[in-house]
Amino acid sequence: GDWGTCSWPGQECEHDSDCCGSFCCVGRRCLHIYFPCNLSRS
């Protein structure tokens, strides 16, 4: 996501792109996951 306005883990999000770097948006919160975001939801 955009480093200027991105959300860090624990902050609210709507999409993975709302989260900083490669953090994933899960349950409307950014999380640090050790594999691609899409795999975490399959």
Swiss-Prot record:
The cysteine framework is XI (C-C-CC-CC-C-C). Disulfide bonds join 6-20, 13-25, 19-30, 24-37. Keywords: Disulfide bond, Ion channel impairing toxin, Neurotoxin, Secreted, Toxin. PROSITE patterns: I_CONOTOXIN (PS60019). It comes from the Eukaryota. The keyword Secreted applies. This is Conotoxin Au11.6. Belongs to the conotoxin I1 superfamily. GO terms for molecular function: ion channel regulator activity; toxin activity. It is found in: Secreted. Expressed by the venom duct. One of its GO terms (cellular component) is extracellular region.
